[in-house]
């Protein structure tokens, strides 16, 4: 059996073939324009400035991004390479650019003649070849396609009678344009006609510039004996009279007879013969309808027309000029009013936005911690002033995976690792007490004072406090800190499984710790670190020092204060150490960093006893950690010299941390910015906590 004819399938095949054909033609068109430009590039043999550097053959599909090329709908409409000092010849293939409207190649070093193909441009409107080394004869067809103002050829070496004649015509055109510009600057009294088809005119003080775009010349007649225009020249007024020839007069009269039969508003010609009318040349812009309103209409010049001549028609002229002038004045007034209205509305909207932003951030501001629900004394309430946000237990429980990820357990509290929804890691310290009755008022006051103290510290080399959590059912007291993922300094110095620290890393840790202690001691009032040891120095990914503080300091063993009167026994509160104690601890810490020995061990005893013999005899090389392959002797001497001053037994003789930083900085060239972590997750953690709190 034969196959049955399926007209629908045949039509669909034809339709797909048509689409493929159109797409291929479109791509060929795009490729052809790119290759045309490359042919022009091939004829350029000198490009001193590298103007055509991005005209690559491999990138011919993106020719619209080439220098000097302007496209519309992937079609080249303008090629502007003026002043590029290009040398070579003109490519006749440029005429294949079907949408090219402007070709500007002036102020180059192009030679040869103009190709005859340039006369076959489809839509070329402007050609500028000035100031080149072109020669030969200009194609005559090119003079017919483009007018003198749109074909610029001066500054070349063309030959031929037609070329010279065209260049002279172009020069005359420039001279005429210059004269028109001079006339545009001279104010004059011109004649405003009532009707374009009539010659009856009235005096009007204005002058329409001759060189305005789309202007043309009108011959205006009147029945008076003279046509006069008063002009200002060097501060003087004079009258110009123009006397037409007999031929012009006869032509004008025949035109007048024709107009009288076809114009209802035309006035009859005078019975008595009058002298031949005088003609002047005035420029008016092209428009439809009556002439536009002219300014200064009220300042009229006395009529120069004799009484014997017919009077002008002032009524129609007033109708033609005064209402538009008044409309322009009203329009200007309305524009000013609208301008003030728009400015006022914009200012009002801006004020609303500012108020809304302030209200939004005040609403999301950090919540202050309120007094303890069981009741606190006035001194306890005053001691608790902070600005860190309060968090919910459920949020921290989710971040810490039900508090299953334990970093380290201490005497009295446990530290958990958590991850916020944004991926930022945090450390959560939670007290070991699980019942309210076991949490004394002294513990509560110590807890709140700890939050108040740490919330005042905001340094890049400090484990900053970013939140807290307190609930009574179920009972919990927690603090949220930054997380330093690279362990502690103690682990890197004494645990062989941890990554080894070279000399530069150790000096950077020393400087970062010193900068942080100086910042804490210079606060008002000063803040001292509770227990400055190597296990309290945490390291970031780039081995920057982050000084960590003991979150729950009730178990630090500090000496108690003297009892004070009140409802709370102040002797239970630990006394924070003095800044001089931190200076002493920093001296011990520096010896531990450079030697790699424990600060205090049962086998070797105190590090001070071990290091004293080297410090007294200036035998500093034997103090260096054996695992260090290289070190800087000048920096070692500076560290040991500062350590001697920090370890003085008399607290009054110990230097301030500011002096310590200055002495170290003179030798160790590590600034405060270089000692800080390159990437700190603190701000991301705060942002995440604030956003979750607002929702």
From Swiss-Prot:
Region of interest (Disordered), ranges: 302-325
Signal peptide positions on this chain: 1-29
EC number: 2.7.11.1
Segments crossing the lipid bilayer: 341-361
Cytoplasmic side: 362-695
Phosphoserine: modified positions: 652
Assembly notes: Homodimer. Interacts with MIK1, MIK2 and LURE1.2. LURE1.2 enhances the heterodimerization of MDIS1 with MIK1 or MIK2.
UniProt record similarity statement: Belongs to the protein kinase superfamily. Ser/Thr protein kinase family.
Protein name: Protein MALE DISCOVERER 1
UniProt lineage: Eukaryota, Viridiplantae, Streptophyta, Embryophyta, Tracheophyta
